[in-house]
Design a protein with these regions (language model features):
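Non-catalytic alpha/beta scaffold blocks inside enzyme catalytic domains
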Residues: 1-7, 15-177
Length: 177
């Protein structure tokens, strides 16, 4: 249309809907894909990750957020641990999100701010600021950027440590450091 495809220094740069969606999807946060956009239904792909991670991976994809909310309204999805995202504000159908959150038995919000989703929380956990985190983010150009913390988390735990504590309390054996 504008002649900006196929030439050096130009191209398509689709913007994603939320911060670091690119990086989290690259790492396998989609319910139907493992890291590197490898589909969970492919036996050979699952085997690679099962061997690497030492766990069995279900070949059925998990639910996406809208499907989780549908299932909550229907009564089959009972709880949500929402970390670092205000789904009530980021989803285009706020009434759908509110109905789903209200129908759940347990909503845990782990965030830096008491956001709109936190209004539905049974438990709110304080999150860490960017100053308290080590990690990476991927920008819209797919450049990976390193982040280094400048201070320890004031709440005592890094966000990933809270996730690990929850997982271990539910029977996992996560020993990340």
């Amino acid at each position: 249309l504008t002649g900006n495809i196929g030439r050096p220094g130009v191209g398509v740069n689709p913007l994603r809907g939320q911060n670091n969606v690119q990086g989290s999807c690259d790492m396998g946060s989609f319910p139907h894909e493992l890291p590197g956009y490898r589909h969970v239904k492919i036996d050979a792909v699952r085997t690679v990750f099962e061997d690497m991670w030492g766990v069995k991976i279900d070949n059925e994809p998990g639910l996406r957020i809208p499907n989780m909310l549908d299932a909550a309204v229907e009564g089959s999805f009972k709880g949500l641990y929402c970390q670092g995202e205000d789904i009530l504000q980021s989803d285009p159908d706020t009434k759908h999100v509110a109905a789903g959150l209200a129908a759940m038995d347990c909503v845990i919000v782990h965030d830096l701010f008491l956001n709109e989703t936190a209004n539905y929380a049974h438990v709110f956990l304080p999150g860490s600021t960017f100053l308290e985190k080590d990690g990476t983010f991927t920008n819209a150009e797919r450049r990976i950027n390193r982040v280094r913390k400048v201070m320890a988390p004031r709440n005592g735990y890094a966000d990933w440590e809270v996730t690990q504590l929850f997982a271990n309390a539910m029977g996992a054996n996560w020993t990340y450091t």
